[in-house]
Amino acid sequence: MLERIGLVIEVHPADVDENVLAGEAPEAYVARIAHAKAIAVARRSDLWVLAADTTVTLDGTILGKPDTPEEAAKMLRWLSGRTHQVLTAFVLLGERDDSPVIHERLVSTDVTMIELDGAMLADYVASGEWRGKAGAYAIQGIGAALVREVHGSVTNVIGLPIAEVVAALREVRGPLPRLAAGTPA
């Protein structure tokens, strides 16, 4: 997503344990995982590191990525007609003026689903779009038809709150080069 606004990035996977700890609140969970990812990558790189983790939560329960069509249908039935939160924690690590910099932020977006009838639910699950998606839907795809309202960052729901990340980059690194689609920064 950052490449679309002209930033040049390198992706370095972080091998961290993403299991939820007993009694861990969703906000604490995404913050812990984003921080662990940032530290894991920073140990292998001298570049600025941006790490993030996103989850879907309803009534304080974390909704992960369903493994089966049945799990996807169960999640979607639970979300049907209700407002849930998409939480993303991101961490920026780097150096500025020979001093270490760490910036952590949590972004929350409220998403309200329409009431899903049986046919709509069955059709969406049959599409397979839910695979690999926390909360069992993808707002950037046909899952957009399941969403009535979004309050907050739409790009957060897609996977990364771009405006908030760019603001944080400007805060910790200073002015960024010109941002334009297709123009590397």
Question: What are the residue ranges of the model-derived segments?
Answer:
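Anionic-ligand binding patches
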Residues: G23-A185
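A short beta-strand-loop structural module common to alpha/beta enzyme folds
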Residues: E10-E18
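N-terminal G-site helix/loop of the GST-like fold
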Residues: M1-V11, V172
